[in-house]
Every structure is written in C-alpha cells, then in structure tokens.
Amino acid sequence: MRRSSDPSANKKKWTKASNWRPRMVRWQRQLARVNALESTLQAEDDQTIRKRSLALRYRAMAGEKLSELLPEAYALCREAGRRSLSMRHYDVQILGGIALFEGHITEMQTGEGKTLTATLPLYLHSLVGKGAHLATVNDYLAKRDAEWMMPLFEMLGVSVGIIQTEDDQGGRRKSYGAAITYGTAKEFGFDFLRDRLLLRAQNRMQTEMLGSGDGGFSNSGDQVVMRGMHFCLVDEADSILIDEARTPLIIGSIEDTVRDQIIETYKWAAENAPLFELDEHFEIDDETKRYELTARGRSKVRALPKSDLVRTMGLVDMYEYIERSIKTHREFLLDRQYVIRPSEKDPNVDEIVIVDEFTGRLAEGRKWRDGIHQSIEAKEGVEISVPTGQAARITVQDLFLRYPHLAGMTGTAATSAGELRKIYRTPVVRVPTNRPPQRIQLPSRVFGTLTSKFEAIAKEVEEIHATGRPVLVGTRSIDKSVLLSKLLDDLGIEHEVLNANNVEREAEIVAEAGGRGKVTVATNMAGRGTDIKLSNDVEQIGGMHVICTELHDAARIDRQLIGRCGRQGDRGSYRQYLSLDDDILKGGYGAIKYEKLKKRGEATSGSVDRLAAMFHKAQRKVERRHFRDRMVLMHHEKERKKMQREIGQDPYLDTPD
C-alpha cells in the first residue's frame, strides 16, 4: 500500500475540500499527539501494548472522555496494525479516523485504505463496553473485512463478532457480545425488530405469570441478541444511507384466511395481463409511475373468464391485481431485477430472488412489497409465497437514526453531502489521495440503439485488449452482461463474467481482473467493496481501462465503477457509452418523450455524441426525484412515530400493513 506519511503534503488538499480550517487545525494537533507516541510504542513488546489497551478500557469505562483517549488509542491501533498486518495507518488515515470519531462521513477513494481506517473509531468506541458496529452492504464484505482486521484487534485484546444471514440466535448473541461487531444493515435491522417482538412477548407473559414465582425466561433460549445501539460505522455509506434509505425491513405475520383465493387471483391476473394494451386499456402516470386501468380496461376485466375463487374477489381488488400484474410484466424482467433459482430451503422448488440494482448482488431474504413479489412469482410460474402482514417494520433510514453515534465511509459521498447532513446530521469530508490521480476521462459515445452501442463497445474492448491493458466493462443488469459476453465470444476475446449468478467466483475473478490482457464484464458487483490491483507490468502500458455501458439512477454509482481504475495514483482511463433506448432517459423524461427518442435512435446510424449532455440532465432529474421521495419518507416516518407514541403504540411493532 503506497501512501504518503507527510501530513503537510495533504493539508492544503484536505482543507480546501472540507473548507473547515478551525476543525482541521484541531485535527492536526491530535495527529501530532498520535505521531509523538509512535517511537515509544515501537520500543515496547506485544504484552505491554496489550496492557496499555486494557488500561485504556478501564479509563473509558470509568468515565474519561473518549476524545481525551483518542491520541493513545489511535497510536496503539496504528502500532497493532504495523505488527499484526504489516499495515501502518498513514497520516491521512489517522485524520480520517478522527473525522469518523467526530461523526463525519469520509469520502476516500478506492485503494486508499477504508478498511484499515475503520479500525480506528471502532476500537476507540469499543472501549466503553457498549459495542461498536460496522455495517456494510453484504455478508461477504462483512466477513472478509472482519477476518482481515481480526489480528489487529486481537493484539489489542478486543473481541470481534461477525453476523451472517444463516447464524442462529445463540451465534448472533455471541457476536453482539463482542466488543466490535461486523454485519449488514439488513441483519442489524432484523435483529432489532426480533428483539423488540421478543421483549413485548416476554412482558406480556411475565404480566400473566405475576405472582407465580417463576420468571419464565431465565433458562430459556428466548433472549434478546443485541445489547443496545451505541456506535455504528457505515461502510459504503451513500449506498446504505441514501440508496437503501426507503427500503423497509419487515418481519411478516402469516395470514391463512384467504390464502387460496389470493394465490388463485395472482395466477389469473398473470395469465391475462399480456392482453391489456397501453393507452387503450391502461395508463401510466409519468410522475408517480402508477398504473391505472381505463374504462375500457375495467370493462375488459369484468368480461374475462374467472374461476369460482376469483369470482368471489371484490371487483376493485380484481382491478388492482390486473394493474399490478401489468406493471410486473412491463417493468420487472428476468435477469435484470430478479433471477430464478432453486430455493435454499427446498432445492426442488424454484424461487424469485431480487437483484439489488445498486450492488448487483442477490438481495437474500428481501421481497418486494404490495404484492409485486407474488405477482412476479405468478408470471414466472413458480410457487407463490404466502402473502404476509406486518408483525414489525423499520426503514433503513430510521434504523441508523437510532444510533446516538453514527459515522460513515464511502468512495462517493461529496455529491450527496447536503442530503446526508440534513437527514443524518453527518457532515461529509473528502480525504485526499496520497498520490495525485492519473485517471483519464475519454469522450462519451452516444448511439441510437443498444445493439449498435454494444457492437462499438466490443470493438473498443478488442482494441484495448490488443495492447495488453486490462479492461473492465460495467453493465446495469445480468441479461446485458450476458449479451455483451456473447459479442466478445464472437470476436474470440477470452473474458470473465461477474454477476449475481456466479457470486461464488467473485474473489477469484476480482483477484485476476487487473492482470495483463484480462477482460472482465461485470454488473455493479464490481463497483463496490472491490479493490482491483494491477499486476506489475500493467501500470507501464497505461493501467486499467473501464467502460460504463449506461448511466445509473445516481451519478455516484457510475463513479463507483470509474473508481476501479486509477487506484492509489495508478494510471488508468474510462469512457461512457450511451444509447437512445437507455432506461435513464425514460426515468428522466417520462414514457412519451422516451418513446420518441427511442424511435429517433432506431432511425439513427452511427454515433450522435453531441447528445451526451441530455443523458446527464435526465440523470439529475431522477436524482432530484429520488431525493424528494426520501425527504417525504423521513417526514412521514417522523409524523407516524410521533402519533403512535402519543396514543401509546410501539411505532415499530404496531405498524399498518
């Protein structure tokens, strides 16, 4: 890891980025105190280092302020990293760690050591004995980072727990009992809800057993697993705190009364949805994206043949089932938004698994709400899961607002600084790179259709591949990664494909992606949590070349992919390819203008690069709409909780379906 250890070399860049000179002066003073301890600690043996760490814990638990313990704690953490991992925290990482301790979100570029930086505030907050959590986007990254940093923490006498989806209650309790716990936002949220449900059940039972002399739970396995929410460091903070903010985490309660009728109606709607035509039978609201049947559409529903079970369903409900099914047929596509695979519970039964657009990974255990998931199951002919009510619910946004101490790290937060500060009260600071970036942006290319765009991409891959430089091509969906892979096969270009269907090979593919002559086609899986290292001879011939095949709903996601090249000051280049049938145009300008652009594209031969600005304008429109949605969510959740508390309800358990 090549980093500068001279703080003065980075001071100007940092101060300019944050524009907070007084705060920066104070951080530099703390850095100087950390540096002053380095030679002393290097002269001490491992046992003395551990004793120092134990003494710090006693002082913290006795009430001494963590800000006063910070210099020694960070110096100890740096020395433990040097000895156990051969990785020394450089000065900019120490500064980043100070910012994290003070509740900031730090923007650190790929390869600049976010995982190592995270150990600093995690260790410091763990000293008070209330637990420190690190939340990341998936189980793989949680396990990888925890195991990677574990020798450092063990040298300091600090225990580490890892939460994985398959863990049982006992395993989770043990992991939360550790000083530091790595896991995902989803698992932290579900454990919070399960504990809350359990506490309610215990309170009711204890009330019923009052006077019996038997506590009822002391020897039971039914015990809460979390021990509170003190500090959370959010990795990939923009993805979790912004992109996933509206995602509700729901524990369902099974309804048996009308199961057969509901399942039969889903099948009936899926069978008949393709018969309905846009404008004639249904309309789509450009703002809300809501599907609504026209008078002719409702008339068609009434005329459709129905089984006895479906016939007993209310007419308004039938309309909603058809509208929902039309939406899933048009907008939810196999190998884009979801995949079909054998169920983990029963390999003989297929199931629908969501593909997370922001990470490109399978969203294990997550289901779409409002009947969308069941409608897709009916469309694909797989077993329809039992519709559920809500036993408990919390949004990702609300989950992290419960932590009294919150901080985050990401490679792309500056563009969302205002939103993060407004919702989470977490200012954003940009940590400077240790070497000047050498990433080159090549002019964007615009084509009429997806086909002509992909043919041009394949040609560019062929040209770059001939030079020996590694190439990474990012796609928005699984089906497009497969399509591009076929084009490369036709050209005889050996390559790897990384998407949610072969996640088990992720580590192997990523490890080789920076090698000479390597070509990798990947979904967003390659955009977050991956650090593609170049082989020794690649830097001399220009480094990695990244191709973005279309714009995402947020510019931050595009920047994540671009950040795979030019890591740690290495050379690299990237280019964006766009076409007039890209989804971002539909999201930004609406269905009517999108169809006009699409027809224009079909009549266009060659490239129309002058239209590139139109795509970025559409992206900004989508970003603004999503921002408004998140603001509305925050206000709605705040008002709902306030009202429920006023009438004596639990805002997380007494939730409307």
Curated annotation (Swiss-Prot):
Catalyzes what? ATP + H2O + cellular proteinSide 1 = ADP + phosphate + cellular proteinSide 2
Source organism, top-level taxon: Bacteria
Class of enzymatic activity (EC top level): translocase
Q: What molecular function terms (GO) are annotated for this protein?
A: ATP binding; protein-exporting ATPase activity
Subcellular localization, as worded in the UniProt entry: Cell inner membrane; Cytoplasm
Nucleus among keywords: no
Q: What protein name is recorded for this chain?
A: Protein translocase subunit SecA 2
Q: Which organism is it from?
A: Rhodopirellula baltica (strain DSM 10527 / NCIMB 13988 / SH1)
Give the classification, highest ranks: Bacteria, Pseudomonadati, Planctomycetota, Planctomycetia, Pirellulales
Source gene?
secA2
